[in-house]
Amino acid sequence: MAKGKMDEVLENFRKEIQGFISCDVVNISDGLSIGGGSIDPKFDASIAAAYYATVASAYVKTCHAIDKTMEPEDMLITTDQMLLLMRVIANNNYFFGLAVTPDSNLAMCRLIMKKYEEEIIKAI
């Protein structure tokens, strides 16, 4: 794992996201973050990573149970305080999660996440 490269890629990514709160690249099987973090001191990204890995794993299993050829892309979780967009990447082994403020532009977030996906996969 090229931790320095991952940090660089995610720092560039953060600069493009309006309403950024947190992002993480997380191993779905163990819930451990391999890069990322939060600008909000009240938001513990490591706890979120661990719990959302369970959600991402269930999402992948559900897609494949419905149709073995169905490939998961992303999922959206909303709360009164944030929007969480998670993209399943790297052969369903990792997810790239982004938390933003509720007034953020989701379409732009999705586009920017897709833009950085290959760089993130290379840095894993």
Predicted regions, residues:
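Non-catalytic interaction/Regulatory regions outside core domains
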Residues: 1-124
